[in-house]
């Protein structure tokens, strides 16, 4: 594969692989809690602790395809570095949500809200990339440098709670 092409997606691939490891960690937590309660077989119902782990995992799994789509779309069509940074932030927030959900449910709320904001940022980056493509196609105007500067400048603002 061409090194330039790999360089354009390597950060996105790293974030994706980290997210796969995180999914495996969440699934392992569900498995451990299931075995602790019922022995060998996996059960979908059980103790309150199992219900919380299972529900937290399910909530993370439900949002995962959306995260992957906006991460890769933003990274490919707009700018890889801010998209990868936002992706890493989303993974930290998802971890906070998962761990918070295992405690009191109010502890998971900041992670949930912060995660929505990061998904929105990635979605807006994707839209900017698509809009830029059509501006080039129809009018010959390329705003890629402006969009890249704006997204690179705004992405650290995701750290503000």
From Swiss-Prot:
One of its GO terms (cellular component) is nuclear membrane. Residues 31-52, 103-107 are cytoplasmic. The chain crosses the membrane at residues 9-30, 53-77, 81-102, 116-128. The keyword Phosphoprotein does not apply. Keywords: Endoplasmic reticulum, Leukotriene biosynthesis, Membrane, Nucleus, Transmembrane, Transmembrane helix. Residues 108-115 dip into the membrane without crossing it. GO terms for biological process: cellular response to calcium ion; leukotriene biosynthetic process; leukotriene production involved in inflammatory response; lipoxygenase pathway; positive regulation of acute inflammatory response; protein homotrimerization. The C-terminal part after residue 140 is mostly disordered. Homotrimer. Interacts with LTC4S and ALOX5. Belongs to the MAPEG family. This is Arachidonate 5-lipoxygenase-activating protein. It comes from Rattus norvegicus (Rat).
């Amino acid at each position: 594969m061409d090194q330039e092409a790999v360089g354009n997606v390597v950060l996105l691939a790293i974030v994706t692989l980290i997210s796969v490891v995180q999914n495996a960690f969440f699934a392992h937590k569900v498995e451990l809690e299931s075995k602790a309660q019922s022995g060998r077989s996996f059960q979908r119902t059980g103790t309150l602790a199992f219900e919380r782990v299972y529900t937290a995992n399910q909530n993370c799994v439900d949002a995962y395809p959306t995260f992957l789509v906006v991460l890769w779309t933003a990274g490919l069509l707009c700018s890889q570095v801010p998209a990868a940074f936002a992706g890493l932030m989303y993974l930290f927030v998802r971890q906070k949500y998962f761990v918070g959900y295992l405690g009191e449910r109010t502890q998971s709320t900041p992670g949930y809200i912060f995660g929505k904001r990061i998904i929105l940022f990635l979605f807006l980056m994707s839209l900017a990339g698509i809009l830029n493509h059509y501006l080039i196609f129809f009018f010959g105007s390329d705003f890629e440098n402006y969009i890249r500067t704006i997204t690179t400048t705004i992405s650290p603002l995701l750290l503000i709670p």
